[in-house]
Amino acid sequence: LLDAIKNYAPDAKFYQASTSEMFGNNWEEDETQNELTAFRPRSPYATSKVFAHHNVVMYRESYGIQGSCGILFNHESPIRGLEFVTRKITDAVARIHFGLQDSIELGNLEARRDWGFAGDYVKVMWKMLQQDTADDYVIATGQTRSIIAFLDRAFAHVGINSWEKYVVQNPEFMRPAEVPHLRGNPAK
């Protein structure tokens, strides 16, 4: 696709959806990741995203294509798939509340993520493509919350103040190389 833009549509603008998972374990307590933070991917998914990100940067710098990379931190919406922890939790909490389910199995409860609303992030993507010069941008809120905090709020929303009896930690859901903390710096 990048080669086609270079050869046949050099004025086209291209958006690459990169991911905060590219940063991996590259963090210190109370620090944020920005466009200059080194990548240390810890999964095949993150590694493939680093490859795609670097390809866009290379085509932009070498051939002048208008390719921008949005380094997206976790973005959520009501249509997010149930395979993602936030939707898994909200779906299970509703089912538990209505007596349709007894518990929920989760992996690492200590993981911290920078969660934002997908609709807001799409607006930022569009604004990126309106710029005169292509560049890379972190798309994030700058705040993190743990899975535990997410559980607290989700269960409290349905009037359950103690979620611990409903949550089972299952080693099967633990990632082999967990990224414990991601917080973006959206200042750019």
Residues covered by each model-derived region:
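C-terminal substrate-binding subdomain of Rossmann-fold SDR/epimerase-dehydratase oxidoreductases
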Residues: 85-188
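Short, conserved SAM-binding segment of the class I
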Residues: 1-4, 153
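Catalytic helix-loop patch of NAD(P)-dependent Rossmann-fold dehydrogenases
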Residues: 3, 7-16, 21-71, 76-80
